[in-house]
Amino acid sequence: MAKKSKIAKAQKREALVAKYADKRAALKAAGDYIGLAALPKDSSPVRVHNRDWIDGRPHAYMREFGMSRLNFRQLAHKGQIPGVRKASW
């Protein structure tokens, strides 16, 4: 499990990205790069890192399911992920 402070920081970044999205798009369209540089660094969508929605783990993230491989494996073995079956060939 990720530290609570790291999860909170990631949520704060996501909120900043959402808050400045329209302003950032307008500045980009106008080509105002000085104005873009004046915005907070954390308002850039590039700085948002995908995290597991269960425990906040940042590594081994599976986009399709929104969780890390560890939690995916655990839930898949329990049969709690719809459409996922153990492979057999």
UniProtKB/Swiss-Prot annotation:
Pfam families: Ribosomal_S14
InterPro entries for the chain: Ribosomal_uS14, Ribosomal_uS14_bac/plastid, Ribosomal_uS14_sf
Superkingdom assignment: Bacteria
BP GO terms, sorted: translation
Coiled-coil ranges from the UniProt annotation: none
Entry GO MF terms: rRNA binding; structural constituent of ribosome
GO cellular component: cytoplasm; small ribosomal subunit
Gene3D superfamilies according to UniProt: 30s Ribosomal Protein S14, Chain N (4.10.830.10)
SUPFAM superfamilies with a match to the protein in the record: Glucocorticoid receptor-like (DNA-binding domain)
Keywords: Ribonucleoprotein, Ribosomal protein, RNA-binding, rRNA-binding
Subunit structure as annotated in this protein's UniProt entry: Part of the 30S ribosomal subunit. Contacts proteins S3 and S10.
Functional summary from the UniProt entry: Binds 16S rRNA, required for the assembly of 30S particles and may also be responsible for determining the conformation of the 16S rRNA at the A site.
Similarity comment: family membership: Belongs to the universal ribosomal protein uS14 family.
Record's protein name: Small ribosomal subunit protein uS14
Species for this entry: Leuconostoc mesenteroides subsp. mesenteroides (strain ATCC 8293 / DSM 20343 / BCRC 11652 / CCM 1803 / JCM 6124 / NCDO 523 / NBRC 100496 / NCIMB 8023 / NCTC 12954 / NRRL B-1118 / 37Y)
